[in-house]
Swiss-Prot record:
The encoding gene: hisF
The protein's name in its UniProt record: Imidazole glycerol phosphate synthase subunit HisF
Pathway: Amino-acid biosynthesis; L-histidine biosynthesis; L-histidine from 5-phospho-alpha-D-ribose 1-diphosphate: step 5/9
Enzyme class name: lyase
InterPro entries with a match to the protein in the record: Aldolase_TIM, His_biosynth, HisF, IGPS_HisA/HisF, RibuloseP-bd_barrel
Source species: Leptospira interrogans serogroup Icterohaemorrhagiae serovar Lai (strain 56601)
Length: 256
């Protein structure tokens, strides 16, 4: 991690216009209205917001631009949008609707030049490469998965992340599919591997169960930001108390 302030980022996983949350990418349950959730998170000291239309890529349909626009009208914190972004025109459309960054997953893997073209036009600070990984126990490595975790690629995750950074990604959103929704803590080994090998910020995703897990991701995993969904959506913990736990452990955070 760099010496910058650590960021806490709530994630709105969107399906059919509603916030949903599942375990290991399946068994989805409704977690509320995205526009209301966005406004509440901003009031509660979220540093950024992440909006992922989780079935846009697998359903081959357009991202919910009207919803992006409604959320962008409500909030002033940086706002990342992903899901179903396949072309530079998609990047343009999302940014024009008010997003500050775009998160590209499947399409970036299938066409890495999309990262290059997008970063050349809009700047790498706008381009987040999202990578969903699963641990392969037999070979003790992490494999990249596409289409919301449905498609195995056979490619080693760090190898792809390094290429993505070279192609123009300004940040990596790294999700452990094994930990997703389990609330058992982040995969620290995975985070350490990525943060020590890449020169761009890493957002840790998958496994947050309490503020201590987020502290661990920053201090031990050396992540630059932590992303969480279920622990915030269902009200067990607030972003404010998460940040206070971080501050108590010497992590620089924004508290006003």
């Amino acid at each position: 991690m760099s010496n910058l302030t650590a960021r806490v980022i709530p994630c709105l996983d969107i399906k059919d216009g509603r916030v949903v949350k599942g375990v290991n990418f399946v068994n989805l349950v409704d977690a509320g209205d995205p526009v209301e959730s966005a406004a509440i998170y901003e009031e509660n000291l979220a540093d950024e917001l992440c909006f992922l239309d989780i079935t846009a890529s697998s359903d081959r349909r357009e991202i919910l631009l009207h919803l992006v626009e409604r959320i962008a009208e409500k909030i002033f914190i940086p706002f990342t949008v992903g899901g179903g972004i396949r072309t530079v025109d998609d990047v343009k459309a999302v940014l024009e609707k008010g997003a500050d960054k775009v998160s590209i997953n499947t399409a970036a893997f299938q066409n890495p030049k999309l990262l290059t073209y997008s970063s050349e036009i809009y700047g790498s600070q706008c381009i987040v490469c999202a990578i969903d990984v699963k641990h392969e126990k037999e070979r003790d490595r992490y494999e990249v998965f596409l289409h919301g975790g449905r498609t195995a690629t056979g490619r080693e995750a760090l190898d792809w992340a390094q290429e993505a950074a070279e192609k123009g990604a300004g940040e990596i959103l790294l999700t452990s599919m094994d930990r997703d929704g389990t609330r058992n803590g982040f995969d620290i080994h995975l985070l350490k591997n990525f943060s020590s090998s890449l020169g761009i910020p890493i957002i840790a995703s998958g496994g947050a169960g309490n503020p201590e897990h987020m502290v661990e991701a920053i201090l031990r995993g050396k992540a630059d930001a932590v992303l969480a969904a279920s622990i915030f959506h269902f009200g067990e913990y607030s972003i404010r108390e998460t940040k206070k736990a971080m501050e108590e452990m010497g992590i620089s955070v924004r508290l006003d």
